[in-house]
Design a protein with these regions (language model features):
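Short, well-ordered beta-to-alpha junction loops that form the rim of enzyme active sites
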Residues: 212-213, 237
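Outer membrane beta-barrel translocator domains of Type V secretion systems
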Residues: 26-205, 314-316, 321-326
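Extracellular/periplasm-exposed beta-strand and loop segments of Gram-negative cell-envelope proteins
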Residues: 90-92, 126-139, 168-191, 218-243, ...
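Outer membrane beta-barrel transmembrane domains
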Residues: 109, 203, 219, 230-337
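Extracellular, surface-exposed repeat/solenoid domains
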Residues: 1-27
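Residues on the lipid-exposed face of transmembrane beta-strands in outer-membrane beta-barrel proteins
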Residues: 99-105, 145-151, 165, 193-199, ...
Length: 337
């Protein structure tokens, strides 16, 4: 068996009236190089890594309503597994590890309105594997910056806006059928904006419910690259428009005048309205399509353990046909002064 371009071929024979005929017949599936390129050249990995950093306001910063200072420093780490659709019917899995960190300042507009303005940096890395016949793998590194502005109202309303810019370094590798190593790499960049709104309804016993809506747009620059054995890949730009409707239910326990513990449950749906990218591999066009609805649920908590310091953590699971996250764990620390 040999691999030529996107496909593999086996030597077969047939009987003819004038003798035996030998010919190359295409086998099912893709060649090792084709499987690698189709699994790891679409938008899926970068899209999932962006969503991990963006998440929602509560997961990203924890509970921001009960701060005791005007300036804040925070750091958050997370790890998760993604299962994603690639090009040409391929599938990939990736384990992502990331950290974000930031500084913000709380500004009083009047007695009912406050603004939290901040900047953050972020880094993450994904170890990837194509779920196919030949064991292709990859490594995607991401670096980014973001600015955010969060409006809070005394009656529980809030609105959170995030502007982000990211860079991606993608490496991919496999082996041809004869054992020859094959590799490729490309560098891309992306930008996005997100708007989240919601309202917390508080009750006298410390219980609260918080309905949320979020809409985010993300653009990923398409790049061209050639693998070490000559396979050409040409990506179009990718666009994603993701809507989310969710609900948080929790309870706040005051431990003393300056400390509290607040656990919560969350759930909702995300819908990808755009989420497709055209990629041409050796002259053949494929589409990476992530459109569809995904359901999510999770649990988390905030613990104010000192007058100016708080930890927060969350577990979440998301299920969808073309993109899913079997598990995601994050934790953060915020210090105010």
């Amino acid at each position: 068996m040999i691999d030529i371009g996107l496909h593999s071929y086996a030597l077969e024979t047939s009987e003819r009236n004038d003798g035996r005929e030998w010919y190359l017949a295409r086998t099912e599936g893709f060649s090792p190089t084709g499987e690698m390129a189709l699994g790891l050249s679409g938008m899926s990995s970068a899209y999932a890594m962006h969503m991990s950093h963006l998440s929602d306001l509560r997961e990203r910063l924890g509970e921001i309503r009960y701060g005791n200072g005007t300036d804040g420093l925070w750091v958050r780490g997370f790890t998760e597994e993604n299962r994603l659709s690639g090009l040409g019917g391929t599938d990939l899995s990736q384990n992502v590890y990331g950290t974000s960190f930031g500084y913000d300042r709380l500004l009083d507009q009047d007695e009912n309105n406050k603004w939290l303005l901040g900047l953050r940096g972020q880094i993450s890395r994904a170890h990837q594997r194509v779920d196919g016949l030949h064991g292709a793998s990859g490594d995607n590194r991401s670096y980014g910056i973001a600015a955010y502005a969060t409006w809070q109202h005394a009656e529980g309303w809030y609105a959170d806006t995030v502007l982000s810019w990211d860079w991606y370094d993608q490496n991919l590798k496999t082996r041809m059928l004869d054992g020859t190593p094959v590799h490729g790499s490309y560098h891309s960049y992306a930008g996005g904006i997100s708007q989240e709104v919601g309202r917390m309804f508080r009750f006298d016993n410390g219980l609260f419910i918080e309905p949320q809506l979020q809409l985010s747009w993300y653009w990923i620059k398409g790049m061209d690259f050639t693998t070490s054995n000559g396979m050409d890949v040409d990506q179009d730009d990718a666009h994603a428009l993701t809507g989310r409707a969710g609900l948080v239910v929790g309870k706040k326990w005051d431990l003393d005048d300056s400390r509290y513990f607040q656990p919560y449950l969350k759930g909702g749906v995300r819908h990808e309205f755009m989420g497709d990218q055209k990629v041409t591999v050796n002259g053949i066009k494929f589409t990476n399509d992530l459109r569809g609805t995904r359901g999510y649920y999770g649990a988390g908590f905030d613990l104010q353990f000192a007058s100016n310091a708080r930890i927060y953590a969350e577990f979440e699971r998301e299920d969808g046909q073309k993109a899913s996250t079997p598990w995601s764990v994050s934790a953060g620390l915020r210090v105010e002064f």
